[in-house]
A protein has these predicted regions:
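Nucleotide-sugar donor-binding and catalytic loop/hinge architecture
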Residues: 10-16, 172-185
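A short, basic/aromatic alpha-helical/loop segment that forms part
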Residues: 29, 95, 171-174, 193-198
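Nucleotide-sugar donor phosphate/pyrophosphate-binding loop at the beta->alpha transition
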Residues: 118-135, 171-173
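N-terminal subdomain of nucleotide-sugar transferases
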Residues: 2-55, 109
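Donor nucleotide-sugar binding/catalytic pocket of nucleotide-sugar-dependent glycosyltransferases
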Residues: 137-174
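Conserved donor-binding/catalytic core segment of Leloir-type glycosyltransferases
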Residues: 19-21, 178-207
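An aromatic- and histidine-rich active-site surface loop
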Residues: 68, 84-108
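A short, histidine- and acid-enriched strand-loop-helix "catalytic/donor-clamping" loop
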Residues: 89-94, 110-127, 141
Length: 208
């Protein structure tokens, strides 16, 4: 119990130094939002977070990004305890938006952890490799979701540390129900597209 108490105190102290930047997550509708929701609920005792994207139209999204940028500047100006900026991003517009937050954090002398979720990042990278690489190399650490992504980012960067942090899932709220009808029951929660791997999974099931 004493060790558990000490661990919780240390975790609270460390998490208080982190400022998280990412999409609207209170009512998660996507993978990144769900990860952030789980971080707040299950991982970080103190979850300092600024939302930099959300809304149903381009104007709302732009206003959310601008307000998030200003809020981040205020927080970094007034709170010297915030030492690490943890930015969740993906590809295309998400990465372009995150680039401004990376630059702002470095301008204030903070460490930057860029947590990349985008499955289309390889396709995105070839659209502007020089600029994208410059943003990545400004970061102190890049977080990827798998070994293959880690290997990929090692080939296009030359500065930041690269670490693997797999997405966490919430523990089940109810006991598992067992089915004994001889059938395979598969629940897929996500966008039905090639990048998510659902078609590969169905193909493997068909073959085996």
């Amino acid at each position: 119990q004493i060790l558990c108490f000490i661990f919780k105190m240390l975790t609270r102290k460390i998490s208080g130094h982190i400022l998280t930047i990412g999409c609207e997550y209170r009512h998660p509708k996507g993978g990144v939002a769900q990860v952030m929701y789980n971080y707040e609920k299950y991982v970080f005792p103190v979850f300092n977070c600024i939302v930099n994207s959300g809304g149903t139209n381009n104007v709302a999204k732009l206003l959310k990004a601008i307000s998030g940028y200003l809020l981040m500047a205020i927080h970094l100006t007034t709170d010297s305890h915030l030492r690490i900026v943890h930015i969740h991003t993906s590809s295309y517009n998400s990465f372009k938006r995150s680039a401004y937050f990376v630059r702002l954090a470095k301008a204030f002398g903070r460490k930057v952890v860029l947590h990349i979720h985008g499955g289309d990042f390889k396709k995105y990278y070839v659209t502007n490799p020089k600029w994208i690489a410059s943003v990545l190399n400004r970061c102190d650490m890049i977080v990827t979701l798998s070994e293959s992504w880690k290997n990929y980012f090692q080939t296009i960067t030359n500065g930041p540390q690269i670490r693997i942090v797999e997405n966490i899932v919430a523990p089940p709220q109810e006991g598992c129900q067992l089915w004994n009808d001889g059938k395979c029951h598969l629940l897929f929660l996500g966008k039905v597209c090639k990048e998510k791997g659902i078609f590969d999974l169905l193909d493997v099931i068909r073959k085996h």
